[in-house]
Amino acid sequence: MAEEHAHGSSTEIDYHRVKADPTARISPSCSLVGDVTLGKKVAVMAGSCLRGDDAPIVVEDECNIQEGVVIHEDYGKPVVIGRHKTVGHRAMLHGCVIGENCLIGMSCTIMNGAKIGKNSVVAAGALVTEGKEFPDGVLIVGVPAKVRRELTEEEIADMCTFPGDDYLKQTEAMLKDGVLFNPAPDFDFQA
């Protein structure tokens, strides 16, 4: 009989549930474990860890998860990352929801229950505390994180849209050079 966690989930977890679109681009040195879903053209770079033990992690189409990123859910708190997003080096996302077309800065931390609106930028090193919610189209900075100001359409294009497009092109080149790989239709990362 399975032991029960303090939050009521079983310790018998199926860690072979990763689902990746065949167009995803994956580094052989990343870690994908548990209930993780990668959309079309998602790139997961070296040293990143996505671990879905008790709730799902969903990374929607055309996201770039850069080197050293940690993404983990919590009991009843899935991680959902909207399409066309850049998650910067060494960022940590835990039990949060990120809107589409955002830039998540290097070494920032986004905690359980936090929500980031679409077309937003979370500055490098920011700490988004538990349960904090931010609207669409804002610059989020500091420890603890606060809205600095609204972003202009030009800033959204320069900081969110264009970098995401550039990373898609870079990961396509890495795929062609064998640095990244596409998963097979019967992909089982832990096999």
PLM-predicted stretches and their roles:
Residues A2-V44:
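N-terminal segments that cap or nucleate solenoid repeat domains
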Residues A2-K19, D53, V59-D61, E67-G68, ...:
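Glycine-rich hexapeptide-repeat left-handed beta-helix
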